[in-house]
């Protein structure tokens, strides 16, 4: 989340740096992207009816699944950013899969389809079409506990 992806004009992050992936590919990041895009959008969109300070990712998701072009574009842009970050990550770790968890991952193909397409556009040809993009089936709050347990298991082997 705190890998810098925008060195020039990055959004300020709570960690104290600017341009962190988390400020673009998270629940908060999606809202910020939507707020930025609404300001210059001249077409019809449900997002214009929502006060900027009350807009949520769920609002954007609901608009997208109901065909709102701007909301769909927000998820596409977020997915593209995520796909580029995954391509960079895969260059030095070559994972078999990326497993996404949490509120934003619940957007499913709205997010993951453009992420995978962009990943395949930017990844080394050696890795193209090899990594899977999966949505976790774990319950909220379970991933951190299982991850910590797995680390403990590996340390004690």
PLM features: what roles do these ranges have?
Residues 7-12, 17-157:
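ATP-binding/phosphotransfer module of carbohydrate and carboxylate kinases, centering on a glycine-rich
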Residues 1-6:
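Short, intrinsically disordered, charge-biased short linear motifs at domain edges
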